[in-house]
Amino acid sequence: MRLTAKQVIWLKVCLHLAGLLPFLWLVWAINHGGLGADPVKDIQHFTGRTALKFLLAALLITPLARYAKQPLLIRTRRLLGLWCFAWATLHLTSYALLELGVNNLALLGKELITRPYLTLGIISWVILLALAFTSTQSMQRKLGKHWQQLHNFVYLVAILAPIHYLWSVKIISPQPLIYAGLAVLLLALRYKKLLSLFNRLRKQAHNKLSL
């Protein structure tokens, strides 16, 4: 049985709740001592993990829609991507304001250079910013064929974000490894497309070098 347009609307409502409820829990935890001994780190890790969850969920939609034969499921992909960007922005903001502090924001550039895992994180965020800004149908029409080329960069985020997470933790625990494994699995489901993209980029690079 295929999803109807009305069911997709209700599914989107549920996804909005899934994006909002963690924020409400975080606010409650901050105000009621629900965080650990290092609340700043807990906030950073919580916001980062939530962003990663929405990224993986967005990547899951296409293969799920294909294998389950639910084409309307694709309509939820943009929403998941926007929630991923929202939580990634909270993650970046929590680092800038809580870790560095308002008076030390000038140090952010130095931090990005001296801590490579932060570089991976900011690259991922900039890509997500571009994808969020161009996610509307009007931008899709305006960019034409370049729209898909731009949004293929989500696969780069799917590589960089788990590495950023793994690199940022001092002690490797099962959790970041699970996220990394899920990202690898979701990318593996697209190996034909990724191989095609790689070959196209290699051909373009070869042509430019030959000029």
From Swiss-Prot:
GO terms for biological process: protein repair. It is found in: Cell inner membrane. GO terms for cellular component: plasma membrane. It is a multi-pass membrane protein. Its main location: membrane. Pfam families: Ferric_reduct. The chain crosses the membrane at residues 8-28, 54-74, 82-102, 116-136, 153-173, 178-198. Keywords: Cell inner membrane, Cell membrane, Electron transport, Flavoprotein, FMN, Heme, Iron, Membrane, Metal-binding, Transmembrane, Transmembrane helix, Transport. Binds 1 FMN per subunit. Binds 1 heme b (iron(II)-protoporphyrin IX) group per subunit. Its cofactor is FMN; heme b. One of its GO terms (molecular function) is oxidoreductase activity, acting on diphenols and related substances as donors. NCBIfam families: PRK05419.1-1, PRK05419.1-2, PRK05419.1-4. Belongs to the MsrQ family. Part of the MsrPQ system that repairs oxidized periplasmic proteins containing methionine sulfoxide residues (Met-O), using respiratory chain electrons. Thus protects these proteins from oxidative-stress damage caused by reactive species of oxygen and chlorine generated by the host defense mechanisms. MsrPQ is essential for the maintenance of envelope integrity under bleach stress, rescuing a wide series of structurally unrelated periplasmic proteins from methionine oxidation, including the primary periplasmic chaperone SurA and the lipoprotein Pal. Heterodimer of a catalytic subunit (MsrP) and a heme-binding subunit (MsrQ). This is Protein-methionine-sulfoxide reductase heme-binding subunit MsrQ. It comes from Shigella flexneri. The gene is msrQ.
